[in-house]
Amino acid sequence: MVDSMRYISTRDESRTEISFSDILLGGLAPDGGLYLPAEYPQVTGDMLDRWRKLLNTQGYPALAAEVLQLFIDDIPADDLTAIAHRAYTFPKFAHAEIVPVTKLEDGMYIGHLSEGPTAAFKDIAMQLLGEFFEYELRRRGETLTIVGATSGDTGSAAEYAMSGRDGIKVFMLTPAGRMTPFQQAQMFGLNDPNIFNIALEGVFDDCQDVVKAVSADADFKRAHRIGAVNSINWARLVAQVVYYISCYLHVATSNEQKVSFSVPTGNFGDICAGHIAKQMGVPIDRLIVATNENDVLDEFFRTGGYRVRSSADTFETSSPSMDISRASNFERFIYDLLGRDAARVADLFGTQVPQGGFTLADDPAFSKVGTQYGFLSGSSTHADRVVTIRDCYERLGIMIDPHTADGVKVARGLRNEVDTPIVCLETALPVKFAHTIKEATGREPDLPDRFTTIMQAERHVTDLPNDVDVVKDFIAAND
């Protein structure tokens, strides 16, 4: 247990420290920054040995409780244990291990993150977040209005995690017509009086901009008790740190062995948790950033230039959850890379990013991206995804979704630069992207039994224009 775990904003030069519970229900810091621990807790070899035994004997929830205690000191340990065990149960998760790891081929593994209720990796963080929110709201006697944006998987994971919970309403913005039929059915088929689906004109980043504008209106945020579940919420990252540790423990037989991860990446949330785990001292070798055609992050890790794309330059791809023009969690990594220089980060992300981006190509810190922080990157195309899905299915008998295929393709392309086992983090089950799977394999993906009725469900969704005030009015009218 950390003596005093406190959190600071990436843009706060005074490093004002606040508790986990005080950042849990919010998203952005008041100054527009993102929260990170004032110091990362450190993992020792003895802790890894204990956790390896714990994972083997008591399972994923027990490991999660121990990791959470490193980051949270204002919720009693017994309560954290109960929260973790409620979040990670079988059959809510379809596999008793919660996050099983299987071998794909020599030197490469799949970390199965999609066994949850909506078949996406985001269930792992969202189920924990739902428990945290309900616990903290009950403790405070308060209610919460969640306003979020999704390109597909986040929204359904959030809605299923928050559905039926006391004192929580959800308003989820989606880009109209940009999600797969299965994703739409999952979200819009949920019949809950406290869940509101909004189909917004535009792309995912337009949805995210509206959410940020709503959160930036301090009076509106206070009046309607607005909270966030998008990947900028710190509690989601904490939840994701756990599965990096569990995957590491599954693959590495001793603490001397290092493991690398290949992570399909859009918003830099999933791989940011890997960065945090590495900074904690978990023996992670390389962190491989795998993008699709929307290669904002690959471009940065190759050139040092972070160039925000316009909506018109954001491609609609067959791995749509990664169709982003800028990465909302990236600020956290840049804060660490620049020696936690809050003034510089505030300038980069508060001033330069809204004007199109920045470059660190000539900054001495950029050389640390690979050497100190372990990052590699690559991008993938639709043709790459189809070939990778077909190869995994025909040669290995394993069906993967298009986002996971991006991760596998990029990892294979960098195999000569990585001399440690690579865990490719799965992002979703193939059923969520049936069109691309059929194109690649000639057959429909299997539909897990738990989803057999979803496509016939009545739809619950409201179409709105890309207008912050109209969205605010809708929230106010239904809050």
Where are these regions (language model features)?
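PLP-dependent amino-acid enzyme catalytic core
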Residues: V2-D479
